[in-house]
């Protein structure tokens, strides 16, 4: 009888330990050994258990991979931030800054706004997060010259691969729907390309939509100009112009 009870207890203990062992094995996976879709599938398996703080370190590691390899998985980053939200003692401001930077690189998607809802306002005012919220405000209000001044004054931004390129591409998109033609001087200022050769190379990379004519750059194709002339409203114009008129 006692032997039967001992066996039952051992079976119960084994059943209890098995999920813990499986969980530990899951978070012990070396991310560097996974590539491409295999890595994404593994991360998706982790975030399915989105309230388990044990996965936070692995998601932080994956965030660093996103930074270094210029990839992006918003769901993984938002899951990590949610874990910080429910486990404030594990909060890592450096990791939050990195995920906010990746969200800015994905403008004009509202990823940054979504993440900001999960960050206490008092922490938003602390570095290294404050510089990101300031930049977000400049970009949202189309204060592009101020945005570049801010970016150039903080090495944090230049240390993130492709960050400046992504921000420049976002600004280019805004300019393309705002201006039909713009002076090459103003375009250089708004894109933070003071070197004429670099600016011309950038404009040429946008061809055939962008075209240089003397000191002016056309930012829209003839077809785009006609379509926008047919659909542009005064209400749209009244919202955009104040951000450029100083």
UniProtKB/Swiss-Prot annotation:
Residues 72-235 form the PCI domain. GO terms for molecular function: ribosome binding; RNA binding; translation initiation factor activity. GO terms for biological process: formation of cytoplasmic translation initiation complex; regulation of translational initiation. It is found in: Cytoplasm. Residues 1-21 have a biased composition (Low complexity). Its main location: cytoplasm. Residues 1-30 are annotated as: Disordered. PANTHER family: EUKARYOTIC TRANSLATION INITIATION FACTOR 3 SUBUNIT 11, EUKARYOTIC TRANSLATION INITIATION FACTOR 3 SUBUNIT K. Belongs to the eIF-3 subunit K family. Component of the eukaryotic translation initiation factor 3 (eIF-3) complex, which is involved in protein synthesis of a specialized repertoire of mRNAs and, together with other initiation factors, stimulates binding of mRNA and methionyl-tRNAi to the 40S ribosome. The eIF-3 complex specifically targets and initiates translation of a subset of mRNAs involved in cell proliferation. This is Eukaryotic translation initiation factor 3 subunit K. It comes from Dictyostelium discoideum (Social amoeba).
